[in-house]
Amino acid sequence: MSLPNPADLIRQMAVDLRAHLARRGITEPRYIGIRTGGVWVAQALQQELGDTSPLGTLDVSFYRDDFSQNGLHPQVRPSELPFEVEGQHLVLIDDVLMSGRTIRAALNELFDYGRPASVTLVCLLDLDAGELPIRPNVLGATLSLAAHERVKLTGPAPLALERQDLATASAL
């Protein structure tokens, strides 16, 4: 199975997001990308939409519920939200939805900043391996992978997807 082209997915996601926001009457959404791949997708999506509003970024490392098991990511950076969260319509963007734990962590962090009017979830890929009841409002594609496979977004320019085989990596 070949992996989809992120640029093609983002073009369709822009169409779908525009329609989703219009149906809900949202005219001034605030975009937030989850580091690192979600920020790249958010930048590409904003460019496709022609939206030049400031982009917020979240690093959810301290909010993850598996922090004690996996430890701290070596490149933790502060979150940056150049706008108020309280009462805003947020578009939360990530690259790959797998367990749902990153999104849960992002929502927890966002609510520490205030109570948004709404949160629209946008994901480039859903790996259909959810452990939590989290589903994107706008999705590029769903992939079904073997238990030992993962997909990684590389970028930021150009964005590309690469398949990783954990069985091969652990054998090295």
Swiss-Prot record:
GO terms for biological process: regulation of DNA-templated transcription. It catalyses: UMP + diphosphate = 5-phospho-alpha-D-ribose 1-diphosphate + uracil. InterPro entries: PRibTrfase_dom, PRTase-like, PyrR, PyrR_bifunctional. NCBIfam families: PRK05205.1-1. This is Bifunctional protein PyrR. A motif (PRPP-binding) lies at residues 90-102. Keywords: Glycosyltransferase, Transcription, Transcription regulation, Transferase. The lineage of its organism: Bacteria, Pseudomonadati, Pseudomonadota, Gammaproteobacteria, Pseudomonadales. Its EC number is 2.4.2.9. GO terms for molecular function: uracil phosphoribosyltransferase activity. Regulates the transcription of the pyrimidine nucleotide (pyr) operon in response to exogenous pyrimidines.
